[in-house]
């Protein structure tokens, strides 16, 4: 009698065979035998994901029960489904698996979830899920060199003869990806645990080109920007996105944060105050002008700013308070030209910058007033000024 590893407890009966925790090499071989992918010239398994080449946030539902009803932020992303409908869908899936081979893996689900416990921060993931579009070995050597045997590559076009990946070809999708184990990155911190964070970095991508590339936030401002979650959806991250779309995604990841936002904001504020953690907002978006005219923030400058923040090199430098966005901007940062730190200075037309900055600040104001009218006044006042 074959081992089923307790799958019958979730109703999964009569599998043809169960393969559990098999090696990447074995799984790659099975995928090739099943015609599910091909090998690149570096030995990576390259597959196509069909018509779904990005997240499908409209397909998320939560079973609505009395025990969770009052804690969920019900909206067009967190949509309720009855227990009866859930059980019907589950039965359909279980029926599909009858007499089929099952590939079982013991691990956590989720690509980028992490946690903060009283003992410190920790990662749930055991690898990286990197974007590959326009991948350049000079600018991103770690990702480029990680695409080898044991790596799963999605929707990247291969040369028919050489099987060499063409990372600049987006005819399948802009959202080309590579998933690889964490130990493929030479400087990865393992086992994915750290102490209490002394610095928190919020990443945003401003397609308007007006937010500073790095700014320091007070506790209240950190809670404001955490709840607001301003960024831009960039090409390929979701179906149908071909150019950046400015968006306010609650908590910088509304599709992944099902609880009411004030719960998460309160948790963050408590930890910032308890541990005296510094918080910075880093803009990886556009500089010099909006998308289409300006340029994307150079990755080397972003890395230099984050390194300086983490190393405490921004603790004692002079700061300038930006009255429009209500944040403190460092005047100097190692490895970054001073002009880059001041977004207004990067625009040729300063009047155009002022007009755009006022427009973006008004967007912040209207979004917060509409979505979070009951937030504490000190958090509301920590946002941009109209």
What are these regions (language model features)?
Residues 1-107, 118-386:
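A noncatalytic interaction/capping subdomain that flanks phosphate/NTP-handling catalytic cores
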């Amino acid at each position: 009698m074959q081992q089923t590893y307790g799958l019958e407890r979730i109703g999964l009966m009569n599998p043809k065979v169960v393969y559990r925790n098999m090696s990447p090499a074995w799984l790659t071989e099975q995928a090739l035998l099943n015609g599910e992918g091909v090998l690149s010239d570096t030995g990576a398994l390259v597959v196509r994901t069909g018509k779904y080449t990005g997240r499908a946030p409209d397909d998320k539902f939560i079973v609505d029960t009395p025990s969770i009803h009052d804690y969920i932020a019900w909206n067009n992303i967190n949509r309720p489904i009855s227990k009866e409908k859930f059980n019907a869908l589950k039965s359909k899936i279980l029926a599909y698996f009858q007499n089929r081979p099952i590939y079982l893996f013991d691990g956590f689900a989720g690509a980028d979830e992490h946690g903060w416990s009283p003992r410190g921060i920790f990662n749930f993931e055991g690898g990286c899920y990197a974007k590959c579009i326009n991948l350049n070995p000079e600018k991103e050597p770690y990702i480029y060199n990680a695409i080898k045997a044991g790596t799963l590559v999605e929707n990247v076009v291969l040369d028919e003869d050489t099987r060499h990946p063409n990372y600049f070809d987006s005819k399948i999708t802009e959202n080309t990806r590579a998933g690889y184990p964490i130990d493929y990155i030479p400087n990865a911190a393992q086992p994915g645990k750290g102490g209490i964070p002394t610095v928190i970095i919020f990443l945003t991508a401003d397609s308007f080109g007006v937010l500073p590339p790095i700014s320091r936030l007070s506790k209240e401002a950190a809670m404001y920007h955490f709840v607001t979650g301003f960024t831009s959806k960039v090409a390929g991250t979701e179906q149908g996105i071909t150019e950046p779309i400015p968006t306010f995604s609650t908590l910088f990841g509304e599709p992944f944060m099902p609880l009411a936002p004030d719960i998460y904001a309160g948790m963050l504020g408590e930890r910032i105050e308890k541990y005296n953690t510094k918080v910075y907002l880093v803009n990886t978006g556009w500089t010099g002008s909006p998308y289409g005219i300006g340029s994307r923030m150079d990755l080397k400058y972003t890395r230099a700013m984050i390194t300086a923040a983490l190393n405490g090199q921004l603790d004692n430098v002079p700061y300038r308070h930006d009255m429009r966005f209500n944040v403190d901007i460092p005047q100097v940062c190692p490895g970054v030209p001073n002009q880059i730190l001041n977004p207004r200075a990067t625009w040729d037309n300063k009047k155009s910058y002022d007009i755009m900055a006022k427009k973006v600040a008004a967007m912040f104001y209207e979004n917060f007033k509409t979505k979070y009218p009951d937030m504490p006044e000190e958090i509301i006042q920590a946002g941009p000024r109209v």
